[in-house]
Design a protein with these regions (language model features):
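Structured catalytic-domain cores with a bias toward divalent-metal coordination
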Residues: 1-267
Length: 267
């Protein structure tokens, strides 16, 4: 049975005290590029840092995943017959107890977004210190994500396959290193808004789709927030209307959810 393993490189003094992870999804190269750039930069690290490329076969193939979505099977099972289940278990073990930044990218949103679970207060505190405009608790709407594994901060760095997303990923990773004391540089200013994902709205079965509203903007009851194409590829085939006042978001796997703002000044 194949034993898939993440690619791991430890840098800095002593045992690893934190981790930076890219490549959970193989079609999101910004995190992998950020990891490689940081390794090539030969940083003067003040603490041990574990750099990880999570899913090398998917990265090499340029595919989101090969068999199962890795970011939906955590914490995984080391004895499972499914390769992603085994890989998830190894990734959890490699980052166990380490504050971790996991870097992703999206199809739609160019601004960075931090996601963390309040079940891990340290992760939520770290997310709030990153220079991102939004911090999102996705726990109620997403099962099996890496954020549920430990002290994990997920970063959506921007649009997939763009140089801007790779540059943002590196900047945010450097900010994470500064916030955690691994780099002896001032941490950048942060003042995010906080959101919580509440109700999952599955992506409709279609080759393509259109989000009709802006990310993180309020959606009034009755407003069309998304549509799918007809056979002639127009974007009026099927419309989806909000049944309540909410905030719509879209992530790389499609139109996923509606979110409600939570007001919390806590860091």
């Amino acid at each position: 049975m194949e034993k898939p393993r993440p690619t791991i490189e430890d840098r800095g003094p002593g045992e690893p005290a934190l981790a930076i992870v890219g490549g959970i999804h193989g079609d999101e190269p910004s995190g992998v590029r950020a990891v490689k750039r940081l390794l090539d930069a030969d940083l003067s690290l003040q603490r041990g840092v574990r750099f990880v490329v999570a899913n090398p076969p998917a990265v090499e193939a340029g595919e989101r995943y090969l068999d199962k979505d890795l970011n939906r099977v955590f914490p995984g099972d080391p004895d499972s017959s499914d390769r992603e289940e085994r890989l998830a278990a190894r990734l959890c073990a490699a980052t166990d107890g380490l504050p971790t930044l996991s870097i992703h990218s999206t199809h739609s949103h160019s601004e960075p977004i931090a996601l963390a679970s309040p079940e891990y207060p340290e992760a939520f505190r770290l997310a709030a210190q990153l220079p991102t405009p939004y911090v999102v608790d996705e726990t109620p709407a997403v099962d099996g994500a890496f954020t549920a594994c430990s002290t994990i901060v997920t970063l959506e760095a921007g649009c997939q396959h763009t140089d801007e997303a790779a540059a943002t990923a590196e900047r945010q990773a450097r900010a994470f290193l500064a916030v955690t004391g691994a780099l002896d540089t001032p941490a950048p200013a942060a003042d995010p808004s906080f959101y919580r994902m509440d109700i999952p709205v599955e992506k409709p079965p279609a080759e393509s789709y259109s989000l009709q509203v802006a990310n993180f903007e309020p959606v009034s009851e009755g407003v069309v927030y998304a549509s799918t194409p007809t056979e002639d590829s127009s974007l009026n085939g099927r419309s989806f209307r909000s049944s309540y006042r909410s905030v719509a978001t879209r992530r790389s796997s499609g139109i996923r959810d509606q979110s409600s703002a939570i007001r919390s000044p806590k860091r």
